[in-house]
From Swiss-Prot, chains A, B:
Highest taxon above the source species: Bacteria
Keyword annotations from UniProtKB, A to Z: NADP, Oxidoreductase
UniProt-listed Pfam families: Aldedh (PF00171)
Entry's family note: Belongs to the aldehyde dehydrogenase family.
Protein name as annotated: Alpha-ketoglutaric semialdehyde dehydrogenase
An MF annotation (GO) of this entry: 2,5-dioxovalerate dehydrogenase (NADP+) activity
Chain positions recorded as NADP(+) binding sites: S159, N160, K185, A186, H187, S188, G240, S241, E393
């Protein structure tokens, strides 16, 4: 790290009024890693927001090509960090190096996908209604609409994806692609990782000739709230707990000027196993299910926390296989001490709750930082009564299996679930005739419905939705993964009877950007 | 009116536990029109929301063609109401028959435009990323996204457009097009008008075979709050005052499950007159400006309430022409007694505020229900200090003119303005080189920027934006006029590895609906 280690990133400078006293902690042994950070002052939060606003005034006028090149350059600079990035991230989060290598690829892939999106140009949503001077009873004026960035965006790093949902993660990329500047609040769980990535972004800013305050980063506790309340911040993206998300959401809505606050929060991601699939391959499904809820130590927003099927001998065998596989599951290091404590509290709460019982546990932890996998079984009454304990996300390597009497009970029970990021149906061809009503129900409940896979893989692509009805997110109309994520930070503006000289290229006659536009009700590249 | 006059419209039935005691009032003489309405009970609000929810479960699965036909049928049924509709609306609102005839055309045109939008199919935002089983290091699954309705929507009628922003107005049509059911809260200022239009919608529901609870309407005070707090309501559209809008917005955000609440509220719609335009045609601009702020008795959300130019002899002449024209302006009937009272309070507040003076008044009212037009002049200090009185919308036939020292002062002053629905630049060709920075500034402030026209004409088309930064609306990402209005009530859902048998037609291989879709990053109709 440089001599500036631990200072805020503001307007291309490193700034810190406070001494560096916040310690980066090793996730494995809870000892300091040696990296220290300064708590941002209120004045520094203000400086960061001001810098973002001043940069926005220029950055919003960059061309789509300039922004695409900038995102590509960030990807290169992140690659240039080399293995140091994964090593530091592994220290701070306890995640395995191979996972962090994959996550780095996801970050750079995501940056390049958004660059493609920018070059494609349909994110502008360009619409042109040309003048109809002869129309009766009234002539029509010339109207041209496109989408522009809402302004400076506050982004909150998630603990569980120190790269892909953090400093240069999905929300940051979506905001930068939209033409918005960013103030990023570094997560306390991986500040040194954030520092490295921020340095890469700063280099990309310099290399690309982008305004220096386009990206800013602050460290510290409570500064997130200050940031959300800052009048120059115009939107925010968050990934984290329901409690944390709603606290910030409420601040955002209760400002003198409310702002869009997209929080991705809580989901138990039900998996429904259909009878014929269980008959055909129950044991394999059980193994894959256990692998999915243990993947990344169960620290995925899309971890399948609820497994439901209809009572049958095949389902009993499936549960037996879940138990057997869970018992072989190895303990893994959790992201930090707080996360492990929350996990253990969540497990204890279920152990003490009527209708739930722990039916299998994985191997015992060998390190103080490891979590033991657990499998619970719950009565169907817990589902049918809408018991909030069932719907409370326990972040970590556990899941709950429920057998229901019949299909009607299954549908009744699922109807009681709150909004979800994902819902999964494990089905064979012969199950499909029974799956239609189930699919309709789950479509109302979730942002993504998947068949014969597990929700823990979240592809970054145009068609992905990582969102869903509350409490999965604070606004079901958004996604935080995939190119659709840009929509959260765009607003439409309409120019009426505006001279060609003054119009942006995207709306000019002759379509100089060669993008698809809706012209007089017809999608065209002309 | 039928014998059921005054009861709630719930699930295709007329229901009222309370006696009809709320009077419809004639806007001209403040006497009862004779139509009486029943205050909805809390139980009736619940019945309406339940009916909307049950209908949504079916209505959401109607095809785009079925919904398009339904909207067309509503237009026909509204036309079938004949001149009775405008006569009743004229009684209740004091608006001239010819205006209400035009507004009826706007309503039916809007319904048919949304039917076109549905048939075009791009509102689905269909995106397909096909599986890449050979991709390294990980295969890609098949992902298909489209947009679906968020659920039952609460819609609030606006006082100033008893047809176009009311029962079958922009918000209702956008929600119905999105596949959402509606509970409409009738505005107390035109309940008999609302009753007629609701009857037309009910006929269209019957004729089109649409589920009976797809549209519901309730009467009464405070029921709007009950509606927004009802757990089955999933979004809301509102047009009205800042106070009313924010009260409901706060309820919507503080529910256990917050919901999107799109409120179109407050805007002073600045008009900037450029030097060369004034030199060339100052007197004509003055006449048109006065006509615009008096149109519809100044009761448009887009009324130009602020006129700004740079000091010059031509600007002085322009102000003189504004004064002369204002003095000839005739008084018109306001929508209701409350609106007139608010207008007079707004005028009184300006008369008592330092920095403002009334420089012209129109002809004196002859009826108790008429408003007198007024023109104010304000010091530039009022603009530069961001005086909230200047930014407070005074709903009615008035405007404020300000002369500023120079272009820099103009830009500084405009920077102090809050968000606007519209901003207007009156410019000649030779003004355009100076207009670029102004345009950039106004683009940040407004949802629509227009040249050489007046904002009071709001075309209903694909490219229109009737929205803008707070407090113009509660969310700058939406529009309540034009086909873009549908976006507010749609959310994306993604199907992963889903069988062709179960996929909706919009996402099937072979594109059976022949719509434009984004397939593997390419917009195509294949």
């Amino acid at each position: 790290m440089s001599e500036n280690n631990g200072k805020q990133f503001i307007n291309g400078q490193r700034v810190a009024a406070n001494a560096p006293t916040i310690e980066s902690i090793n996730a494995t042994d809870y000892q300091p890693t040696g990296y220290l950070f300064s708590q941002a002052t209120l004045d520094e939060v203000d400086q960061a927001a001001q810098a973002a606003y001043q940069a926005f005034l220029k950055y919003q006028h960059t061309t789509q090509q300039q922004r695409a090149d900038f995102l590509d350059e960030i990807a290169i600079q992140i690659e240039n960090l080399g293995s140091k990035l994964q090593e530091v991230a592994a220290q701070e989060t306890g995640l395995p190096l191979v996972r962090l290598q994959g996550e780095t690829g996801r970050v750079t892939g995501q940056l390049r996908l958004f660059a493609e999106l920018l070059r494609r140009g349909d994110f502008y949503g360009a619409r042109i209604d040309t003048a109809l001077p002869e129309r009766k009873p009234l002539p029509r004026v010339d109207l041209r609409q496109y989408k522009i960035g809402v302004g400076p965006v506050a982004v909150f790093g998630a603990s569980n994806f120190p790269l892909a949902f953090s400093t240069a993660g999905g929300d940051t990329v979506a905001a930068l692609a939209a033409g918005c500047s960013v103030v990023f609040k570094a997560h306390s769980g991986h500040m040194a990782t954030a520092e490295l990535v921020a340095q890469a972004i700063e280099k990309a800013i310099l290399n690309s000739g982008i305004p220096s305050g386009t990206f800013n980063m602050i460290f510290g506790s409570r500064v997130g709230a200050n940031l959300v309340e800052h009048p120059l911040i115009q939107a925010a993206g968050f990934t984290g707990s329901l409690e944390g998300g709603m606290a910030l959401f409420n601040l955002a809505q209760n400002r003198p000027q409310p702002i869009p606050f997209f929080a991705e929060m809580s989901s138990v991601n039900p998996v429904i196993v259909m009878p014929e699939a269980l008959n055909a391959r129950g044991e394999k499904v059980a193994q894959d299910t256990v692998a999915s809820f243990n993947m990344g130590c169960g620290q995925f927003c899309t971890k399948p926390g609820l497994i439901i099927g209809i009572k049958s001998p095949a389902f009993d065998q499936f549960v037996t296989a879940l138990i057997d596989t869970t018992r072989t599951a190895v303990p893994q290091i959790m992201l930090n001490q707080g996360t492990l404590k929350s996990y253990q509290q969540g497990i204890d709460a279920l152990l003490n709750e009527q209708g739930f019982k722990c039916i299998a546990s994985g191997q015992a932890p060998e390190l103080i930082s490891q979590a033991q996998p657990h499998l619970f079984q719950a009565d169907q009454s817990v589902l049918l009564s809408g018991n909030p304990k069932l719907q409370h996300e326990v972040f970590g390597p556990m899941s709950i299996v429920i057998a229901v009497d019949d299909e009607a009970t299954l549908l009744n029970g699922l109807e009681k679930l709150a909004g979800q990021l994902t819902a999964t149906i494990i089905a064979d061809e012969s199950d499909l005739p029974q799956a239609k009503e189930l699919l309709n129900l789950l479509t109302r409940k979730a942002g993504r419905v998947l068949f014969n896979g597990f929700p823990t893989g979240v592809e970054v692509s145009d068609a992905m939705v990582h969102g869903g009805p509350f409490p999965a997110t604070s606004d079901s109309r958004g996604t935080s993964v995939g190119t659709g994520a840009i929509e959260r930070f765009l607003r439409p503006v309409c120019y009426q009877n505006t001279s060609q000289v003054l119009l942006p290229d995207v709306l000019k006659d002759g379509n100089p950007l060669h993008i698809t536009r809706l012209v007089n009700g017809v999608l065209t590249q002309n």
